[in-house]
Regions:
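Single-stranded nucleic acid-binding surfaces, predominantly the OB-fold ssDNA-binding core
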Residues: 1-109
Length: 109
């Protein structure tokens, strides 16, 4: 069987943050905004914005101190896809990044 890779690296601004105590650790779920700049066929600058769902558990290389709305963060992790059935009976998917490393950056980093 060939080796597979599930790796994500993101740097962007934090949106909403929910921090909650967990057994033996602190967990954070937050949204992260990344932006990609490109040019249209006519040469106009376009900014493509993407919101990501992130789950992080403090410890190891995950540092949650200073994680607030607007913070600039850099993280690496993996994608996790969960399927569930909504109240109306439709099948839904929830995609999130589970952080292995997370650092709140200073503005000049």
């Amino acid at each position: 069987m060939s080796k597979s890779i599930n790796r994500v690296e993101l740097q962007g601004r934090v949106g909403t943050v929910r921090i909650s105590p967990c057994v033996g650790a602190v967990a954070a779920n937050f949204s992260l905004l990344t932006e990609h700049q490109l040019r249209s066929a006519s040469g106009l600058a376009i900014v493509e914005s993407t919101w990501h769902n992130v789950a992080a558990f403090e410890g190891g290389d995950v540092y949650l101190e200073g994680l607030t709305r607007g913070s600039l963060v850099h993280l690496t992790g993996r994608l996790r896809i969960s399927k569930y059935t909504a109240a109306d009976g439709t099948e839904r998917m929830f995609i999130e990044v589970v952080a292995d490393t997370l650092k709140v950056l200073e503005e000049n980093e």
